[in-house]
C-alpha cells in the first residue's frame, strides 16, 4: 500500500494521474490529509465514491506510531515515535506566548558524531522517510488541536481562533531534532515543500529553519531547491577546535562553510544566517575564543545563538557557568553582533537541545495502548 504522507503535491498529481484522475484531485487530497488530518478516505466527502474506492484499495494515510508522550514543567512536550525494530525518534513542541515551535527529527541517529551531542553518540541507523518527517508535524497539530487558548497569550490566541488558517498550534518548525537534515536531502526537501504548501501547512519560509553541521554541497543544493531559514552549527572559531567538536569540519572546514553561507544569503528568507554555538566549560568559552569568533563571522550578516550545554551520561563535557556565557556574549555584542543565549527548555524530560538520544529499545518492549489507539509507555 502507498502511504500518501510520502507525497508532496507533485507526487500526488502523478499518483492521481496513474489512477486516471485529474490533477486537481491532488490538491483535495493534500487538504484532507494535512489541513484536516483525515486518515480515512470515506471521510473525504468531496471525492467521488469511485475515487475513494480506488484509494482504499491502493493507499493509506499512515503517520508514525507514537509510543510515549511527556510534558515538562515548563510546558515543553516531547513525543517518541516508533520507526520499527525497537528504534524511535523524538519530536519536541516548545510553547511560547506568541508562537509554538516544533523541533523535528530527520534521521534515526546521526553519522556526524559531534562529540557533545547525545544523538551523535548513538550512531546512525537510517534516514527517515517523508512520511516519518512530515508525520511529526501532522501529529503535533492533531495532538495539540483545541489548545490554542492555552498555548498562546490571550490576544494572540483570539486572533488565531478567529482565523481558520491559523488555528493549528504549530507556527514554526525547526529541523533541529535527531539527525543531520542535509544528509537526508531529498526526503527533507519534500517534507519542507509540504510544510510550505498552502494546501497543507501553509508555513512561510521565514518560519521554517533547517539546521546543519556544515554539509557544504547539500547546503548549495538547498539554496537552489528550497531556501528556508538557515542555522549553522558552528561551535568553534577555528578548524583545530572544530575538528574535535564537529568532525565533518575535517571535510568541509570553516572557510568553505562560511563561503557557502555567503552564497546562501541572497536566496534566504531572512537577511542573516544564525550561527549556533554550544557553550562548553573550559573548551570553547574563553574570552580569547570569543574575540576570535568575532573576526571569523564579522563579514557575514548573522546572529549568534549561544546554547548552554545540556549534560548527559558519559559526555565528558560540562556546561559553561553563567558568568562565562555572559562574558562571551558581551564580547560579541560589543562587536555589533546580535547575540542571544538560548533559554533551556524541557531538560527535565531530556528534551533540551542535544539530549535527543532516542535509545528506547527497552521502552518499546513495555508499551501499552491508550483508548485513542496511541501507544504509551507504561513503565
Curated annotation (Swiss-Prot):
SS bonds (residue pairs): 103-353
Keywords on record: 4Fe-4S, Cytoplasm, Disulfide bond, Iron, Iron-sulfur, Metal-binding, Methyltransferase, rRNA processing, S-adenosyl-L-methionine, Transferase, tRNA processing
Record's cofactor remark: Binds 1 [4Fe-4S] cluster. The cluster is coordinated with 3 cysteines and an exchangeable S-adenosyl-L-methionine.
A single cellular component GO annotation: cytoplasm
Cofactor: [4Fe-4S] cluster
Gene3D superfamilies in the record: 1.10.150.530, Aldolase class I
Keyword presence, Iron: yes
Top-level division of the source organism's lineage: Bacteria
Entry binding sites for [4Fe-4S] cluster: 110, 114, 117
Gene Ontology MF annotations: 4 iron, 4 sulfur cluster binding; metal ion binding; rRNA (adenine(2503)-C2-)-methyltransferase activity; rRNA binding; tRNA (adenine(37)-C2)-methyltransferase activity; tRNA binding
Main location: cytoplasm
Any Pfam family hit: RlmN_N
Residues the record lists as binding S-adenosyl-L-methionine: 179-180, 211, 233-235, 310
Catalytically driven reaction(s): adenosine(2503) in 23S rRNA + 2 reduced [2Fe-2S]-[ferredoxin] + 2 S-adenosyl-L-methionine = 2-methyladenosine(2503) in 23S rRNA + 5'-deoxyadenosine + L-methionine + 2 oxidized [2Fe-2S]-[ferredoxin] + S-adenosyl-L-homocysteine; adenosine(37) in tRNA + 2 reduced [2Fe-2S]-[ferredoxin] + 2 S-adenosyl-L-methionine = 2-methyladenosine(37) in tRNA + 5'-deoxyadenosine + L-methionine + 2 oxidized [2Fe-2S]-[ferredoxin] + S-adenosyl-L-homocysteine
One record GO biological process: tRNA methylation
UniProt subcellular location: Cytoplasm
Radical SAM core domain location: 96-348
PANTHER family according to UniProt: 23S RRNA METHYLTRANSFERASE (PTHR30544), RADICAL SAM CORE DOMAIN-CONTAINING PROTEIN (PTHR30544:SF5)
Stated role: Specifically methylates position 2 of adenine 2503 in 23S rRNA and position 2 of adenine 37 in tRNAs. m2A2503 modification seems to play a crucial role in the proofreading step occurring at the peptidyl transferase center and thus would serve to optimize ribosomal fidelity.
HAMAP family from the UniProt entry: RNA_methyltr_RlmN
NCBIfam families linked: rRNA_mod_RlmN
Note: Reaction proceeds by a ping-pong mechanism involving intermediate methylation of a conserved cysteine residue.
Entry protein name: Dual-specificity RNA methyltransferase RlmN
Protein species of origin: Nitrosomonas eutropha (strain DSM 101675 / C91 / Nm57)
Amino acid at each position: 500500500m502507498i502511504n500518501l504522507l510520502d507525497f508532496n503535491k507533485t507526487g500526488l498529481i502523478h499518483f492521481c494521474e496513474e489512477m486516471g484522475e485529474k490533477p486537481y484531485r491532488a490538491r483535495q487530497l493534500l487538504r484532507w490529509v494535512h489541513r484536516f488530518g483525515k486518515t480515512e478516505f470515506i471521510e473525504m466527502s468531496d471525492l467521488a465514491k469511485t475515487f475513494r474506492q480506488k484509494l482504499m484499495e491502493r493507499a493509506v494515510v499512515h503517520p508514525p506510531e507514537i509510543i510515549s508522550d511527556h510534558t515538562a514543567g515548563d510546558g515543553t512536550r516531547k513525543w517518541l515515535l516508533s520507526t520499527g525494530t525497537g528504534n524511535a525518534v523524538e519530536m519536541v513542541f516548545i510553547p511560547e506566548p506568541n508562537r509554538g515551535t516544533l523541533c523535528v527529527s530527520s534521521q534515526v541517529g546521526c553519522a556526524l558524531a559531534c562529540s557533545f551531542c547525545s544523538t551523535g553518540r548513538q550512531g546512525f541507523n537510517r534516514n527517515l522517510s517523508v512520511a516519518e518527517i512530515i508525520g511529526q508535524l501532522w501529529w503535533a497539530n492533531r495532538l495539540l488541536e483545541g489548545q490554542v487558548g492555552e498555548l498562546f497569550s490571550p490576544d494572540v490566541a483570539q486572533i488565531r481562533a478567529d482565523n481558520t488558517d491559523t488555528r493549528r498550534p504549530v507556527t514554526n518548525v525547526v529541523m533541529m531534532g535527531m539527525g543531520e537534515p542535509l544528509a537526508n536531502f531529498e526526503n527533507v526537501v519534500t517534507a519542507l515543500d509540504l510544510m510550505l504548501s498552502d494546501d497543507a501547512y501553509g508555513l512561510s519560509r521565514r518560519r521554517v529553519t533547517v539546521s546543519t553541521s556544515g554539509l557544504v554541497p547539500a547546503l548549495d543544493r538547498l539554496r537552489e531547491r528550497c531556501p528556508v531559514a538557515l542555522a549553522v552549527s558552528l561551535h568553534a572559531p577555528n578548524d583545530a577546535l572544530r575538528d574535535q567538536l564537529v568532525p565533518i569540519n575535517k571535510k568541509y572546514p570553516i572557510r568553505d562553510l562560511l563561503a557557502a553561507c555567503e552564497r546562501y544569503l541572497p536566496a534566504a528568507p531572512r537577511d542573516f544566517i544564525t550561527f549556533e554555538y554550544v557553550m562548553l566549560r573550559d573548551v570553547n568559552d574563553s574570552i580569547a575564543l570569543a574575540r576570535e569568533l568575532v573576526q571569523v563571522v564579522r563579514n557575514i550578516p548573522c546572529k549568534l545563538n549561544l546554547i548552554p550545554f545540556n549534560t548527559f551520561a558519559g559526555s565528558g563535557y560540562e556546561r559553561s557557568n553563567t558568568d562565562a556565557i555572559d562574558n562571551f556574549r558581551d564580547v560579541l555584542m560589543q562587536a555589533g553582533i546580535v547575540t542571544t543565549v538560548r533559554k533551556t527548555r524541557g531538560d527535565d524530560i531530556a528534551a533540551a537541545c542535544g539530549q535527543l538520544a532516542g535509545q528506547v529499545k527497552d521502552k518499546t518492549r513495555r508499551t501499552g495502548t491508550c483508548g485513542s489507539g496511541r501507544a504509551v509507555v507504561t513503565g
